[in-house]
């Protein structure tokens, strides 16, 4: 029944793209951002607004498009960026801290340019998804308590189809998806939806070429084993805690036992210390401890250890700058946001969605196998100082794909220094970024940009100085 309803929604969305009207140009122009408050002068165009993905429930997703700053943006691909959580904003993180053209100052009063913005090479589309994240909303309150992987992927596909109707110049354009963390679910799940959808057309409007994901949640069992191993090998936890967690935690089941819960809680509360778990070698922010206490970082979730680790919060300092800026009424007017007068404040992550997330696939490995065989370009990258979804977790998970190696492990270089390490498999490339935390473009922006350019070009990462 649910599948039939989804197919019906796709047909409705498809009809709106098959018979474009003059209203598309009017809708597009209505979404144009003339200038953001405190924004430096730029030559590229920006648009933002809402796309309704479910009329009966009143679910609408908010987007922000920053076109390429290159002299010929019409020749550049379109990149959709998704952040994870689940329940965290791509505008708060991807756009404002990582790959977007602007950074927010500490007071939330002004913007300044990001020297390593990815819109030098692509048109960037940031989507706040699912409904309930950031400015995205639903008129059906129960939607906030039964969100999950499947509906998020469905809504994101419907968004894309309808958005392309509003922006027909992007139909058939080379299209890529990127993201990080729990977007390790969102990105491949959406890629599969698009791949399946495109099979019905000889020339599909969504010209999906590939995707890349950083510090990606991939497989509950292997990710969890790899994470605990990272904690121990990086001297964050004791031998005793490491052995206790491996002894008492069964990472193949949905619910953790009390013994497992106690072992993990002891390690995190008594051995970790006050470190930034998303970047273990960088200083913590004063606000970090406050964030930990107020968001329930250590609350017991209903799922696995993995879910317990994913309660929100990247860098709490930069996150607070975004919350100051995007709650400003003049910013919301400029972005055509909060047009329905949402009663709650814009936040970087939704606690409600995080705590009530319903369906979460245990593994992405079957999707990776399918899409790797389909010819899509797939890159997985890991910042190597992240202890939340660490490099060992990703390597443990990817090793179970058993893909043939095309290019053996080697160091790649930037500015006469090792930028990380990489190995190329048949259908998939894996790369590390040296010195980067959970949000790779935040901690190592230049290396992240070089990685992105190599991905777009379909070339291996540079071997030379």
Swiss-Prot record:
Name of the protein this chain belongs to: Serine carboxypeptidase 24
Quaternary assembly: Heterodimer.
Record-annotated disulphide pairs: 88-349, 249-260, 285-317
Glycoprotein among keywords: yes
Record lineage: Eukaryota, Viridiplantae, Streptophyta, Embryophyta, Tracheophyta
The UniProt record lists the keyword Manganese: no
Influence of temperature on activity: Optimum temperature is 50 degrees Celsius.
Catalytic activity reported: Preferential release of a C-terminal arginine or lysine residue
Enzyme Commission number, as recorded: 3.4.16.6
Main location: secreted
Keywords assigned: Carboxypeptidase, Disulfide bond, Glycoprotein, Hydrolase, Protease, Secreted, Signal, Zymogen
An annotated GO BP: proteolysis
Glycosylation sites per record: 54, 105, 139, 250, 293, 338
Means of activity regulation: Completely inhibited by phenylmethylsulfonyl fluoride (PMSF) and partially by leupeptin.
Modified how: N-glycosylated.
Domain of life: Eukaryota
């Amino acid at each position: 029944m649910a599948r039939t309803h989804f197919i019906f929604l796709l047909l409705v969305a498809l009809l709106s793209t098959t018979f474009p009207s003059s209203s598309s140009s009017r809708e597009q122009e209505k979404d144009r951002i003339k200038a953001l408050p405190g924004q430096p002068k730029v030559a590229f165009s920006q648009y933002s607004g809402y796309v309704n993905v479910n009329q009966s429930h009143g679910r609408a997703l908010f987007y922000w498009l920053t076109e390429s700053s290159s002299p010929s943006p019409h020749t550049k691909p379109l990149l959709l960026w998704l952040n994870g959580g689940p329940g965290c904003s791509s505008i708060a993180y991807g756009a404002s801290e990582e790959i977007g053209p602007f950074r927010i100052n500490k007071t939330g009063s002004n913007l300044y340019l990001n020297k390593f913005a990815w819109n030098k090479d692509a048109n960037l589309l940031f989507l706040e998804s699912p409904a309930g994240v950031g400015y995205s909303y639903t008129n059906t309150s129960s939607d906030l308590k039964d969100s999950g992987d499947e509906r998020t992927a469905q809504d994101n596909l419907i968004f894309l189809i309808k958005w392309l109707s509003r922006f027909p110049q992007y139909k058939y354009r080379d299209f890529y998806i990127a993201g990080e963390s729990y977007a390790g679910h969102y990105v491949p799940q959406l890629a599969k939806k698009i791949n399946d959808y495109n099979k019905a057309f000889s020339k599909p409007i969504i010209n999906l070429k590939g995707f890349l994901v950083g510090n990606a949640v991939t497989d509950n069992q292997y990710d969890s084993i790899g994470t605990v191993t990272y904690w121990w090998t990086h001297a964050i936890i004791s031998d005793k805690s490491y052995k206790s967690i491996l002894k008492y935690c069964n990472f193949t089941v949905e619910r953790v036992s009390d013994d497992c819960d106690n072992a993990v809680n002891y390690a995190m509360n008594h051995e970790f210390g006050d470190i930034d778990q998303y970047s273990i070698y960088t200083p913590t922010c004063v606000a970090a401890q406050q964030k930990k206490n107020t968001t329930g970082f250590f609350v017991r979730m209903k799922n696995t250890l993995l879910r317990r680790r994913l309660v929100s919060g990247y860098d709490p300092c930069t996150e607070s700058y975004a919350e100051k800026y995007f709650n400003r009424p003049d910013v919301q007017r400029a972005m055509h946001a909060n047009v329905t007068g949402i009663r709650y404040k814009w936040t970087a992550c939704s606690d409600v969605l995080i705590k009530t997330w319903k369906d979460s696939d245990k593994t992405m490995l079957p999707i990776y196998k399918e899409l790797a065989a389909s010819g899509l370009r797939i890159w997985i990258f890991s910042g190597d100082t992240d202890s939340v979804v660490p490099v060992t977790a990703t390597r443990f998970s990817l090793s179970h794909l058993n893909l043939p190696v095309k290019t053996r492990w080697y160091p790649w270089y930037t500015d006469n220094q090792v930028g990380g390490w990489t190995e190329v498999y048949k259908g998939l490339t894996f790369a590390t970024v040296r010195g980067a935390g959970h949000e790779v473009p935040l901690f190592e922006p230049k290396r992240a940009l070089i990685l992105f350019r190599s991905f777009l070009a379909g070339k291996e990462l540079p071997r030379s100085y």
